[in-house]
Amino acid sequence: MRSNEAARSQRRIAPWNWTAKACVGFASFEDNGDAMKLTAIETIRLEEFPNLLWVYLHTDQGLVGLGETFYGPGAAEAHIHEVIAPYLLGQDPLEIDRHQAHLLGYLGFVGSSAEMRGRSAVDIALWDLWGHATNQPIYRLLGGAVRDSIRVYNTCAGYRYVRSRPTQGTANFGLGTSAGPYEDLDAFLVRADELAHSLLEMGITGMKIWPFDYAAEASQGQYISAADLGKALEPFERIRKAVGKTMDVMAELHSLWNRPTALKICRALEPLNLLWVEDPVFMDHLHSLEEVARSTTAPVAVGETRGGRADFRSLIEMDALSTIILDLSWCGGISEARKVAMIAEAWHVPVAFHDCSGPVVLAASTHLAMNVRNCFIQEMVRAFYYGWYGELVTTLPPIEQGMIRPPAAPGHGLRLLPEVLKRSDCRRRRSELS
C-alpha cells in the first residue's frame, strides 16, 4: 500500500491532455503515466544563413520542440551542447521555470551573451514542446490573449541585410543586388517617400530606418558634421512631406554614438515627431543613456541587446525611457521576456518585441504579444517575411492590413521545412541521453 502511494506521488503528467469536466465547466489535465523525458538536443545551422541557429528538443514520447537564436551561433551552439545538454537531458521538459533557474549560470547571466542566446533558444523550444504536449498554442499557455492581433512596423532592411557575417555595420547592409520588390534599405536611403507610400498601401503604419550609420562609421561615432546631419535627416523629412503623420517613424542609431553627438542627433530629430529614437549610445554606461534620454524631447527606446530581468530592471528604473525593446532570442526566451514585460508594466512602460533575425522568433514574439498587455507593437522585416522566412518554415504568423496574429497550431506553430534538413549546407549536431 505504501509503495503504491509513493509511486502515485512520484508520477508526473506526460503528455498533458485537455479533458472537459462538464460538471464544473473547466478543462483539466489527465495523468497518463510517467513523466516525459528529453532524450536528445539537436542544433541545426545553414551555411547560407551563418547567423541563425535552430534547436530541436526531442522527447521519449516523440514530441519535438523548436527554438531559435541569432548572431554568433557557434558560441551559443557550444554552450547548448557543453553546458545545457548535460543538465537537461533526461529531465521533464515541462518544468520550464525550474530549468530556467538552474541554467542561469555562473557566467553570462546578463546581457545578450552566448550563454543567454543559447538559453533563449532552448527556452523557446521548451514552450513549443509544452504546446505540443497540451495541443495548445503558446499564448493560451501564457494565460490567454488580451488581444487577437497586434500592429506591426517594418524595419526597412533588404533581403540580404546582416546575412553574410555576424557584424553590425554598413559593409553588412546587403546592398548592391536586388532579390525582390522589398529592398527597403536601399529605398529609405534614396526614395524614402516612395517607401512610405508602399508600406501604407500594405496597411503598415510604422517604419524604422537608420541613415546615420554611415556618418557614425566615418567618425567612429565621435562627431557628426552639419552636412552629414542634414543628409541623414533627409529621409525622415521626405517621409513627413509625403505622408504626413499617417506613418509612425523610428530612428535606429545602433548604439554608435558618444553622448554629446547622440544628443545632438536626438535634438535634430525632435521636430519630426518620431515614435522613438533607438539605442543612441553604447549600452555599457547607463548614465550616458539616461543623460541623453532626459535631455531630449525625442522618445528614447532601448533594450534589444540586453538580457535577463536584472539587466532590464536597471533600464526600467531609470524612469526616462519611452519603450523597452526585447528580443526573445537574446534576452532569455519567452520566460524571461514575459517577466521583464511585467516589471515594465508595473512602471507604466510599454514594450515592443524585436524581429530582425528569424521566423521562429517572430512567431514566438507574436504569441507573447497576444498575452502581454503593455506590448503595443511588433517589429517585422517585410523583405524577410515575404522572402527567405518562407523558404525555411512551414508557416508564418498571418499579417493582414498591418496586423499580425499567431498561428493557431500547437506551440508557436512553426516547423522547419523537411527540405531544409536535406540541404547540402545543413550542419547538424546532436547530444543524446546515454
Language-model features: locations:
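Tryptophan (W) side chains
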Residues: W16-W18
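Conserved, mostly hydrophobic/aromatic
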Residues: L38, G62, I84, V122, ...
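Shared catalytic-loop signature of beta/alpha-barrel
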Residues: H58, E82, R98, R267, ...
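Metal- or metallocofactor-binding catalytic centers and their adjacent structured scaffolds
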Residues: H58-Q136, R140
